[in-house]
Structure formats: structure tokens, C-alpha cells
Amino acid sequence: MEITDVRVRKLNEEGKMKAVVSVTFDNEFVVHDIKVIEGQNGLFIAMPSRKTPEGEFKDIAHPINSDTRNKLQSAILKEYEKAKEQEAAHKE
């Protein structure tokens, strides 16, 4: 399964959530609402989730192995950095 498109839909400068992203796989399947989060050890992605009646958050969709997660995170963070640079250029 190949990542064929990454769209940064919303950028935030303040707070820990830095962006909301949609990723398309094989030009056939899209996952919306992946979040770019700033943590203690740098940026990471959080998959879309829902809150259970018990107050826990459960992922709706997620990679099932670390190689796929790393590939997905790398692609998303690369596009996030590009979007940040473009936004900064528009502000100048």
C-alpha cells in the first residue's frame, strides 16, 4: 500500500496540536483527521480516534506494524514542514 497524497488541512501555531492531515493510499482510500502533535520528544502523529463511554480514546484506524507507522509519520511530517514553510512565506 503506497501513500499517494498527504494534505495538511489545518495548521495551528499555538497549543500542542500543530496540524490536521488527510492521507490517501493507492489513490483509492483516504484517512482523515490524523493529527500532528508536539510532544516532549518532538513531533509525532496521532491517528483518528473516538472517545468511549468510559472516557478512553480508541483509534479508528491505525498501522499494525512499526515500519508502516514510521513510513506514514515520515510522509506526514515532511508535508507538514512544507506547509509551515509555505505559510511563513505568505506572511512575509
UniProtKB/Swiss-Prot annotation:
Domain of life from the UniProt record: Bacteria
A single BP term in Gene Ontology: division septum assembly
Keywords: Cell cycle, Cell division, Septation
InterPro entries assigned to the protein according to its UniProt record, in alphabetical order: SpoVG, SpoVG_sf
Signal sequence residues: none
UniProt keyword Methyltransferase, yes or no: no
Function: Could be involved in septation.
HAMAP family for this protein: SpoVG (MF_00819)
Similarity comment text for this entry: Belongs to the SpoVG family.
Designated name of the protein: Putative septation protein SpoVG
Organism per entry: Thermoanaerobacter sp. (strain X514)
Species classification: Bacteria, Bacillati, Bacillota, Clostridia, Thermoanaerobacterales
